[in-house]
Structures are given as structure tokens and as C-alpha cells.
Amino acid sequence: MGANEFRFFLSCDINSPVTFRIEKLDGNLPVKKSSDSGVVSIAEEKKPELYIECALYIDGAPFGLPMRTRLKTTGPPYCWNELITLSSKYRDLTAHSQLAITVWDVSCGKTEGLIGGATVLLFNSKMQMKSGKQKLRLWQGKEADGSFPTSTPGKVPRHERGELERLEKLMNKYERGQIQSIDWLDRLMLKSLDTIKEQESTKHGSSHLFVVIDFCSFEHRVVFQESGANLFITAPIGSTNEFVTVWDTELGKTNPSENKQLKLARSLDRGIIDRDLKPSNIERKSIQRVLKYPPTRTLSGDERQLLWKFRFSLMSEKRALTKFLRCVEWSDVQEAKQAIQLMYKWEMIDVCDALELLSPLFESEEVRAYAVSVLERADDEELQCYLLQLVQALRFERSDRSCLSQFLVQRALQNIELASFLRWYVAVELHDHVYAKRFYSTYELLEENIIKLPPGVNGEDGYQLWQSLVRQTELTAQLCSITREVRNVRGNTQKKIEKLRQLLGGLLSELTYFEEPIRSPLTPNVLIKGIVAGESSLFKSALHPLRLTFRTPEEGGSCKLIFKKGDDLRQDQLVVQMVWLMDRLLKLENLDLCLTPYKVLATGHDEGMLEFIPSRSLAQILSEHRSITSYLQKFHPDEHAPFGITATCLDTFIKSCAGYSVITYILGIGDRHLDNLLLTDDGRLFHVDFAFILGRDPKPFPPPMKLCKEMVEAMGGAESQYYTRFKSYCCEAYNILRKSSNLILNLFHLMAGSTIPDIASDPEKGILKLQEKFRLDMDDEACIHFFQDLINESVSALFPQMVETIHRWAQYWR
């Protein structure tokens, strides 16, 4: 480091807690005097029991909680050598932050005796943070005064300082490495220092007490600076006692010189030079670090410049295209033109990256058209995984009949499931007043093209196919009417069920036998012919959802679904779609966790359908069978197997518990209780009711994941090999899904314009919470330890058990 070079840290950049060490108390404690003498008395026959209380004051006000040392009884000197860490951080400090230190004696009986106090500023007159050892003189009989200015300064006044203080100051510099170390001279100096200490002690007697503390030292000096810039620069206080705001018109604007330099650096005339540029090792590492950034991270100016500079050498790296396109200055026509030319010459990107190009970050029609061309490579099953988000992405298009809408319609013409779901997804968004015209245009385009279809193998032409889809809407309207009628019935759940069957057998008997079969909204490949009144019922809950059994053309065939009115199922639809996608990603890595991604379809903002899976809630199982193990023994007994359950059933239960533990943690699913955890006869556990996602939860202190002690007991307890296997499945699944974090983040980014409550409230915050759950700052091994700690924390959480009891009482009285 040069002689004129001064390296430093800014206090606002240090995110560590304030830390220092209490070394010792120097001097003799005062002897017992009269009670009115103003000095704390210490009985000669009692040994002092001392502790030191440390508190941080900012601008004269206490900040954070005070900390105490342990008791000390042996001395003098009374040596603690104890590290104190405050709850406040260095970045929170102001220029007038000070530490208040008070020494107490608890040997006096019931009341604590005050020895004395002192305060010390954390920054010196040069606005540099103090470091190293500090010797503070106590004001005996006074508690440390944290106000500013203080009445108990620990700094010894200049006129009272002697030779000892001067030497101690030099000693402090020596320990910080600011004075050169010479071995033989150091030994002589230390001996002389001890002699001077004895002389000074004899000279001044024992009139003063000193506390020695050691402040934390950093690699460089720490200079005070507040975080953030103040946009309002106030003038000094004048005689008029008025505040005057002075506006700096250039504050926040770009620097013309920097703009000029940037233009020259990105000049198209440099294209010939840039073609042959190759990054150095340091630049290559920087580029690789940028390419690993999640899609939600904004690139800095230097990072954008770096990618633009080496754009030609990066063309073989398909991961770099989306990052490169974010570096382009699209307002510059020539630069945008070159970027489009390079885009078509770039290595073909994956479908996951194409989804990022459809986000609101990219407005260029050419870029969005390129993304659609990449999506054409996806098969129908993969496309259905993203269909919900692709419909939401229509909001970010620049025209009503965009490439994306035409692509979705063309693929829907080839697959009846895609056609049915596309129609419903678009129809639900017609309630969005801002984009209603955009979605209606896509709806019309779908209708026009389906009607033109020629007859298929079964003789059904395009017009008949469209009418079968329209009749789905008519069916949901009639089910809404039934729900309202049933809710108006006074009485218990049984009376409401009787009313439901009465309606289906009387006024609405046409619903038991349709004139023509209707395609099931949940499974469009399945035709339904009518409702079986005797097998239909409703659930015991506030909204009384209908549980309906429909006939199918096969002899004795049926399908069951749930119709819900009064609840926004779009959020459930999104979560279950994510479960389905994650199940697919896990299976691609040969990990089948026996998940149950049941079908959900929102048919409006307050209505929808769900697939009915025969199962029972954990609350019901524990109430009737006392344990999950007893319940599974009933359906899959095996006397020779562990816990009396077949190995297949137990393995299914463990895998499904692991799968949903990981998924609900990543998606931040809230409001988990034993009534929305269901278990099938074959051991598959799954979650329902996703009213709270992305970290929102109506209950206080929710655990990271829902893993109750009954589930752990069903695996043989926390010490069993099966619980170890469960944790192994969790960690393996977590690391697999982390590899696809960009895909999941891109899908949620496409939902940013949605009116789904938990996303619409703050889309950016929700996506950042999701990104945080993936812990992209860790490697796979570190994530294994991290997730195991999460599991242990969730199992031992006490508060959720109390909330679960309260919830059971509420269900009982419903």
C-alpha cells in the first residue's frame, strides 16, 4: 500500500453485530462509608460479586437490548475477558453512537449495589471507528449516562493524563500493528512499562476505577457513513427558525461523461475488434458468476458491459443469451438490430430460458417471437405444465393477436385437453378489466379455429367439439345455483345433504341424465353423462363444497369431483400445477416420491372444481385410530414387517411425507393443520387447501414445514432408520429441485401480472421469497446440512401444536 493510500471500510456496509471484549476492572473498590456519603458501600466481610452491564445508545436514545457479563468474585483486578455481542449491527450506527458501561455488585443482599459507570463514543473526532483496547475511567456511584453529550465520559480529560496514559495509548497502537515491532527493544519497554505502572499507582493511590475494553479490529479502518443518499439537502438553521429545502436538480441523473464513455465502448464500430476478443481468466470467472445468477437478479452496469464486450465469444454458450439480451440498450435502433441478428445465430436455448424471454422484462416483439419458436419444440405434456403461465404472459404482449396467442391456439387444435384448459384459463381472465379485450381476442381466435376443424375419428366435428366445451360452463352455472340453495338450508350438514339429493331428484333432475355427454372440465378426455344423486354429498366446512359422482359411458363407470363456490381456487390451481411440475422433475431424475397432484380447475374468481381423492384427514385418523400406524395396519397388515405394515405401504408413506415437506417449504405454503393433510389407504400423504403461499400464514410462528410428531412416530421415531431414510429423501429432492430453480422462478415471474391475491399484493417480494428458499448461495453438501436442520426445527416446534389444539376445538363446534 502506497504512503499516500488510505484503505477503509464504510460502516454502512458492515452487516455484522457490534462486538467487543470486556477485559477487566482495574483499581480498588471503595470501602464502606456512611449511607449518605454518595458512595456505594461494600461490606468488608463480604466478597464482591460484580457484573458489567453494556448498553448501546444512538443519538442519546437506547438502541437494542443491554447485555451483561457473568459474575466475578475474585480480584482485584477483576478479569472477565468476555466477548459481548450486541443485537445491533455496525451498519445501524450513527456518528454519535456510544457504549454505556455500568458495574454492579450483587453481594449487598436483595438490592444491587452501583459501583459506577462510564460511556465511550464508538467513532472518534475523525469519524473513524475506535478499535483496540480502551481504558475507561468509572464515575463512581453513577450509572452510565447514555445521553448526548454524556455526563459520565470514560475518556480521561487531557489535563489529567499522565505518563501512564500516554504509554498506554502508544501500547494500543503497537498492538494494532501501527508501531514497528523490535524484539529486544520490546522486552525492555514492557519491563519499563510495569515499573511506571507501579509508580503511577503509588502516586495517585486507589482513587479511580478503570474498565478496560477491547473493540473489534478490522483489516482496514472503518469510516462512518450513513446508508443511502439523502435526496433532501437542508440548509443550516438560521435566525428565522424555518426549514429550507434545497433541491439538487442533478441528483439522481446519469453522468454525461460516463454515458459518453459507455457509448464509445459499445459503439458498433468496435464490432470488428470485439469479434476476436477472448476473456481473460478473471473475466471468464466473472462471466460464469453472472451466468449463474437467478433470472430475478438485476445486472450491474459493469456486468452488462462485460457481457456486451464478449458477446461474440459467448454465442456458443446457450445460457448466456438471456443475460446478453438484458444488456442490450433497446432504445438504440442499431444496437437492437445487431442484438437480434446475434440472437438467431446463438446456440439454441432451452425451453426454460424461453419462458424468461416472455417475462415483462423483454418487450421486443422479435425476442418474444424467438421465444415462441423455442416453445414449439416442447411436447404436449411439457406444454401443459406451463400453459397457465403462458396464458398469463399474454398480458405482456404488445398486440392482441400476438405470436404467443396464435401458437397456443394452434397447439390447442391438436390436443383436446390443451383446448379445454386454454379455454378455461382465458375465460377466467375475462374478469380482468384492464386486459379483458386481450383475453377475449384469444378466446375468439380459439373459437374460430376449433369450429373450422373437420370431423375426427369419432365423427365429432369442430362445431360439436366447441359446443361440448361450452356446455361445461352451463354445468358450472347450475352447480353454483345448487350450492346457493343448499347453503340457505338451516340445520346441520345432514339436512343440507338431504336438500342436495332432493334437488337432484326433483327440480334439477335433468342433471342426473344429460341430453348429450359433456367433457369433464377436469379431464376433457373423459365424457360424463349425469350426476348420481344417491352418491352425492357435501363437506362439513364453512363453504359446504359439493362432492359429486358423475356417470361415464363405460358400464358402471363413474368419476368423482368436488365443486366449490365462494373460494378463489386460482391459487390452489397454481400450487397443484407446481406440485405436478415438481413431481415430473423428480421422476426425470429417477426419484418417485409418490406425490398426489390431483386436478384443480378454477372456473371463476370464486368457484372451481377439484378432483376427489378417496382419503381421510390426519385429524380424523388420529381421532378414530389414535395413530397413523394403526390406520395403515388396518388396510395393509403384515405381521412380519416393521410396525405391522407392508414394506410397500410404509415406503409410500415415507416418500410422500418427504416430497410434500420439500415442496410446501419451497412454495412457502401456510395455514397447515391436521385437517388439510390427507392420507389415502395405500399410504400416500398429500396436502390440500392452499389459501396462503409464498410465506404468508395466518398463524403466528409457523414452522418451516408441516411435520407433526405423529408423522415422525409413524416412521418409528426420530432415531429409527426409516426417519433417516425420510430425511435422505428430503435432501435428495431438495437438491434436485434446486437444479430447476430458474424454471420455477421464471414461471412465477410470468404470474407477476396475475390478480391472484398472494401474488398481486407484492409480486416482486413473493418471487424474492421463493428465490430465497432455494438457497442458491450454497452448494449441494451445505444444503443437505441446512435442510436437515430445518427438519429438526420443524419437528421440535411447540407453538404449532398449541395452534393445532385450538383448531380442533373450532372444528368441533362448527
From Swiss-Prot:
Residues 668-676 are annotated as: Catalytic loop. Induction: Induced by salicylic acid (SA) and upon infection by the incompatible bacterial pathogen Pseudomonas syringae pv tomato DC3000 (avrRpt2). The keyword ATP-binding applies. Residues 532-799 form the PI3K/PI4K catalytic domain. Keywords: ATP-binding, Kinase, Nucleotide-binding, Transferase. Residues 25-177 form the C2 PI3K-type domain. Disruption phenotype: Homozygous mutants are lethal. In hemizygous mutants, increased expression of ProDH1. Reduced proline accumulation in response to salt (NaCl). SMART domains: PI3K_C2, PI3Ka, PI3Kc. Residues 538-544 are annotated as: G-loop. GO terms for biological process: endocytosis; microgametogenesis; positive regulation of defense response to bacterium; reactive oxygen species metabolic process; regulation of amino acid metabolic process; regulation of proline metabolic process; regulation of stomatal closure; response to bacterium. The keyword Ribonucleoprotein does not apply. GO terms for molecular function: 1-phosphatidylinositol-3-kinase activity; ATP binding. It catalyses: a 1,2-diacyl-sn-glycero-3-phospho-(1D-myo-inositol) + ATP = a 1,2-diacyl-sn-glycero-3-phospho-(1D-myo-inositol-3-phosphate) + ADP + H(+). Involved in the negative regulation of proline, hydrophobic and aromatic amino acids accumulation, especially in response to salt (NaCl), either through inhibition of their synthesis and/or promotion of their catabolism. Triggers defense responses (e.g. pathogenesis related (PR1 and PR5) gene expression and hydrogen peroxide H(2)O(2) burst) to the bacterial pathogen compatible Pseudomonas syringae pv tomato DC3000 (Pst DC3000) and incompatible Pst DC3000 (avrRpt2), by regulating reactive ogygen species (ROS) production and by promoting stomatal closure. Belongs to the PI3/PI4-kinase family. This is Phosphatidylinositol 3-kinase VPS34. It comes from Arabidopsis thaliana (Mouse-ear cress).
